[in-house]
Swiss-Prot record:
Protein name, UniProt field: Bifunctional 3'-5' exonuclease/ATP-dependent helicase WRN
Region ranges (Interaction with DNA): 930-936
Protein source organism: Xenopus laevis (African clawed frog)
Family membership: Belongs to the helicase family. RecQ subfamily.
Domain Helicase ATP-binding: 499-665
Amino acid sequence: MTSLQRKLPEWMSVKQQEDRIDDAKKSFCKKNILEDNLPFMKFNGSIVYSYESNDCSLLSEDIRSSLLEEDVLGFDIEWPPVYTKGKTGKVALIQVCVSEKKCYLFHISPMAGFPKGLKRLLEDESVRKVGVGIEGDQWKLMSDYELKLKGFIELSEMANQKLRCKEKWTFNGLIKHLFKEQLYKRKSYRCSNWDIFLLTEDQKLYAATDAYAGLLIYKKLEGMDAHESDSFRVGREGVADCKGVKRQLTDLSKGLMDLVNQVPNSFGCYTEAVRAVDILEDLSEKLEELRNIMKEASKAEGNGLHFQNSEDCSKKDKSILHVACKESLAEHKMDCKNADSQNNKDIDSCQNENRDEDFFMTLGISEEELYMMEREDDKKQTNPDYKLNKDSCDTNEEKDMSYVIESDEDFDSEIIKSLEDLDNSTEEALGTGVPQAGLIPAKSVDTVADEEEDEGIEEEDDDDDWDPSMPEPSAQHISCLKTYFGHSSFKPVQWKVVHSVLRERRDNLVVMATGYGKSLCYQFAPVYTSGIGIVICPLISLMEDQVLQLEMSNISSCFLGSAQSKNVLQDVKDGKMRVIYMTPEFCSRGISLLQDLDNRYGITLIAIDEAHCISEWGHDFRSAYRSLGSLKRMLPNVPIVALTATASPSIREDITKSLNLHNPQVTCTSFDRPNLYLDVARKTTNISIDLRQFLIKKQQGSGWEFEGATIVYCPTRKTSEQVTAELIKLGIACGTYHAGMGIKQRREVHHRFMRDEIHCVVATVAFGMGINKPDIRKVIHYGAPKEMESYYQEIGRAGRDGLPSCCHALWAQADMNFNRHMLGEIPNKGFREYKLKMLTKMEKYLNSSTCRRKIILSHFEDKQLRKASSGIMGTEKCCDNCKTRLICNISINDTEDNLQDFGPQAYKFISAVDVLGQKFGTGVPVLFLRGSTSQRVPDRFRNHSLFSSGKDQTEAFWKVLARQLITEGYLQESSGQTKFSTICGLTSKGSNWLIKANNEQCPSLLLPSNNELCLQRTRVSNFSSAQAHSSMVPHASSNTRSSMPKAGPEKMELKDKFSYQEAERLSKAAGVSKSSFKLQTPCKLSRPPEPEVSPRERELQTTLYGRLVVARQKIASERDILPAVLATNKVLVDMAKLRPTTSENMKKLDGVSEAKSAMLAPLLEVVKEFCIANSLKVDVFSGSVSQSESTFFTPREQERISLPESQRMSYSLFQEQNLSLKKIADVRCLSMAVVGMHLWQALKAGYSFDVQRAGLTPEMKKLITYAIKKPPINSDLSSFKAIREYVPANIDGYPIRMVISLLEKEGSSGAQGQPEFPTQKTLIQTEENPKNVSVQNTKHKVTMGKSMWIEKKPTQPATAELEVTKGKALAPIMLASWNEASLDADTEELFSESQSSTTRPRRRLPEWFGSTKGNAATRCIQESKNLGEEKGSFFD
């Protein structure tokens, strides 16, 4: 037998025959404790499952820092089986059990590399690791990862020392011997594919139990005294006599025969049939082992080896472990690891001492049986149905003791879960292939869907109106709301949920955007009813913050979980707590507690926060949530409220079914965050210059600071440290946060940031999990985000207090290349392709010139969730692109102006991709078109007609064009054969276009103007073209912002913001004065107060706000609470505006409860002192003081009523930017009717504009006026609906409302008997009768000023001498409320048959009297009078 041949077990060697006989003798001396009916050992603690490198390192560091000297770790590893000779599976999973209640599973296989934090933990000699066969695990880790495991303790050796024996133990053997239990193991997952992501719940439980068992064994052996050691010694048990064995076999055979008769014909359809088959297989193997034992016993008896008693059997100290002879031969630690060791010589030599290797060779099986096992394994591997059958045997029993560790890449879990199911599907098992180059038809459909997914994004209706079918909250509701929560009213959706719980006792599913107020939906009801509210929350940090806020409002509350250091359980049982928070794991084990509370005190509701964790398709699945479905069965009369900030329709349906909700009320709000301003710009290589634009000068001292709390996200740790260094140079107090830091350092940074000790954190995406800081004003991404899901979550951490906040993204093309390269480290091909698709979508967002809010909302599949907030889209507060369009008067529908034709170039590139067989990335087609001699271009393509056809363009141009074609969906990237390669192929959209282009002489393809694309094209254009566009190139090439920071809201020069095409528009709009349209910055800490205040008062408000912030920080530090919990920034803003000086007035502020008003009492003194020092009015509440006393208005400003934001924007565009209604409708994505209504509201509020340009022509005005004056209306302006019926249907509603408003104004001024505007004279003074001359001798002109100024120009002196009519001759219509004090004779003649003759002056008549065009009604008015030739208008 050569050295290359497999070693034979010791029991097959002739030299060891005597030892085998002794072993057989020993086997009959031991008491048989290994019965099949032993209870299974189960791990009932929580399982932390980590599959991301950074999280793994963080958790490992946390384990290291929390361990005491006497603590040990239960340790084990898993790897997939490999049955190919010469190959071994790589370690895929590392299990670490820290206590009987917690176990960590680190899934190494999906990680990019071995986590450094975990490596430090395993190589730390001071941290003791225990396990059976752990020495073999050491060599395995050394072989796979060059990691030397240190500080380990071999439990089999420890057991031999304690029990004073020499056995070869296994996990199961020690468990059975020490605890009279057995490990529950099944073939379907013992030797399963441990490298496949995600692990199943059975796999997690199996792996955790192994590490847990090691920890229990160590504690048992460590605490074992001499007496207990003797009781566990091997060989001390009684004799297994012949009669006893025969009796057991007889009973077993009878039981089996009875089972045969009980098997039903339809047993195969039963859900547990597969499990029964597995049990029978295990039983067959056990019987085979038992048969071998009996054969060995017969041979020993034939050789004269008779055993008299137990003393004879225990003469030798050495004994062989017979306890594990009844173990399954396919046990993972026996099969999987042996398969590797037998096929690899080096690993075999390293693992000869491995406990599993040795035990496998001491089994009571023959060489023939070993050969048969190997044949069976080979047969399974060659069977195409093996994988399908194996997967179908896996059960999906839910376990309630594990949860997935949270990560900021929340959506990964959902996608990987779906891809795993896809990989295990029937199609894959049957070998269904995919089209060449990974072009799956379904993806083509997705591409088309992506192309149109941003359609249908519209503004949501105002939700301020209550549902008429739902009663409004009572005075008691409002009183409770104000007393405990500080609010004066509910939001409509909040009251809808609260009313449903209080009155209808109905289940609810609430999908509510961050910052809308989810917590009030479940906190109010138990406080109002004095009942108990149960809140299930996954994050301990969030529970702690919520409890702190409730306690500050005098609401008794607590949280129950492993992190609770206080003894609050007794208070809970006594019914002293109104709101009780608990983890899902605690809830699963505490159902009896909830039943007791409900029976004794009554549970008002059970709220399940972050309910998307229930769904396996959710982005943060936690299996412990699945057990919450039992709550409805145990407490059927308690309403359940499931809340989440994000859930698709499929996830909502899964939540409803999993929780067993009965006819739930489903409430959804939009995902839009209207207070977030979105901005994207290019970054440079100078970090300081890039970030200075977001800084302002400190008011005191030198240096810079951010405008409020700021998070700067960086793609790598190195970048975050570099950014921190640059900010420190600028004098900014900031901290760094990333996974490479120690746990104490990270906690310190988080603590200081939450308490406003530092105002900026520069972090990787690891920062933000569980953060509850509502006053973050800026979120800056210094580097391109990876995908839309994580980007939406990260920017969602800004502005949770409802105040305006900014989200900036600074990126370069190199960031996208880096992200694309990092995706190559993802081992799962399907998941890697999904990530590529998400990266392409993110690149489209960064490059887009359309509304960025619209792109983000289009990512959500639910139309209700995709709706934008009313009045935000198209305004300067929406995003940088919308702001640019407003400044340059660019219509949102002017797409042709923003597109350029790249048809010939696109045809060449797409054809090149097709010619090359769609087998390469974007680089090879570029080399092919450029005629490169690179070896990357196959020689067989060099004679093609397209080869070197693109020399007229630069390599950079072709690369940019390729990215643009991918972004627009004509090309797509998919994973190549290796992890780091990508393949560029045609989508269905690209294929269809190419077919169409082949039949055209000059193909055309309009692509959105892109800075880089146009710039590269310009560089290679002819000299004349370059000269023609030379004025535009500098604008296009300037991708950076101004390097100097600005204290004001303006962020950058206009030319640096525009794309190549938009630069040309800038020159056209250069004549527009900057002062004519003043943009409201979205970065301000507070909205402009209504009505407008004077500049002096605004400046004082800002100063007072700063002092209040300082005072709040002092109070928070004294009380050791978070400043934002004490008082949000919105409360401080309101205090600066309204300046309360008493506790009662303080309570009037929204968000200030009874309890908080007492805590904030010191702020009242700050307000008093400041107002006295600056002579500023205090307690500026409605009705407390007159308007003139509290503000600094001029008389003309008092005439105007403030407008809502949306109406103000439409008015500004129309009046100050001189845009038409159609243009405004295009820019703001509104209908012309809506814009017209905005202008009518502005007119009604006292704002002036040209109504004729707004669509109210003289003919239309005359027609509407006539309809109002004649019966049956009879000048009654109170009913718009009645007037509408008598106006032609082709006239919109807003012109009618404008006429009504004009007539009301005229009537109001006439009733007062005084000029409408006291600063202007409205009567012409004559010598004869200066008091009775009417206003008709003047020309009224509405100018373009801010207020309705009416310019009066006197007519020619000759026409000013009038004979005034007598009072008795005036027409009766003079008494109408909307007429002026005196009208001209022409007007009176229309309504009165007898009219005194007058000498009329030569003057201009209103234009709507002199028209000869129009309908029959208009012509009828003119029959009795020939109007003057000269026409005029009150509104020119």
